[in-house]
Amino acid sequence: MLEVHYFAAARAAAGTAQEQIPDAQVPARLGELLDQLAAAHPGTTEAGMGLEEILPRCTFLVDGSAAGGSYPGVALEGVNRVDVLPPFAGG
């Protein structure tokens, strides 16, 4: 089971703070997971942004480690948690 945790605008667009993806539905790579999540959550934030628009701006933590700039290719085998962190504003 893979847990996906959403924060800030990603949480608003997804309509949930977290979800669990059954092992059989977890794709091989993070980029594929993000496509899957965007398709599963077509809603928008109050500002009218959808998850599909927010995800490219996000930072991703995979089991607590930053995925880095090559995040679409990060393997998800054996991963338990992905955090979706959009840019934060304010102090």
Predicted regions: what they are:
Residues 1-90:
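Ubiquitin-like/PB1-type beta-grasp interaction modules and other compact soluble beta-rich domains
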